[in-house]
Amino acid sequence: MLYQGGVVLAPGNYKLKFVARENESGKIGTFEQDLSVPVSQPGKMALSSVVLSSQLVPVQKSSEVQTKTEGLRTKLASSPLEINGETIVPSVTRLFTQNQTLYVFFQAYYPEKNENKEPIEGNNLRAGLIFFRNGLQVNATPMLAPSEVDAKKYVASFRISLPLAKLQGGRYSVQAVVIAPGTQHSAFSRTYLALQYPPPSPSPTTAPANSPATGEGSKPQPQ
C-alpha cells in the first residue's frame, strides 16, 4: 500500500519523523529526516530537494492510495513524483548496488522573466548531474531537457536515469545543476548516496584426496 501525505510549511528548518505500525503484531518502525524549506527569492531560480530512487512503478488507482492532507491547499496539489503514468519511489536509505539503475528527480522553480525582462521558457531549461567522490568529480551526465513543464506555475520537472555499473563502490555526493541558456539564471542542489561494493568472488576450493572411510559406521577390519 502506498501512503501519501501532504502539508504546507512556512520557510524554516524541520525534522520529519515517520512512524509505521503493523496492526497484527504491533511492531513499529520509525524514520527521521531533516527538511529545510528555503525562503523564496523573487527573480531567482531555485531547486527542490533531489530525490534518489531505484524503482519506478505504475501510477496506482486512487482507490489503492491512502491520501492524508492538512489544509485546503494540499488537497489541490498532485504528486510531483508522478510523470507519464509512472511513480518514482524515493529511497529512504539512499543505499544502492552496482546492478541497479539510479533514477533522480528534482524540480526547478524559475522566474517569469530574465534580467532583460524577457520571458523564460521552461522547456529551454537544461539540467545535469555531477558525481563527486572524496571531493573530486568522477562522473557527469549530459545536460537534458525537462521531463515536464508547468508553465503556469513556472516549474520544470527533471527525471534522469543512469546505470550504476560504471561507478565504484563508496560514498558519493550528487549535485543537480539547472541552467537557463542565454541568461544568468542557474541553480544547484546536492544530496548523497552510498554504493555497495560488489561481493568478493568465491575462491576455488580444492577437493580433498580420496581416503578410506574410518568414521562412524565403518571400522577398519583386523588383518
What kind of region is each of these model predictions?
Residues 1-223:
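Intrinsically disordered, low-complexity terminal regions enriched in Ser/Thr/Pro/Gly
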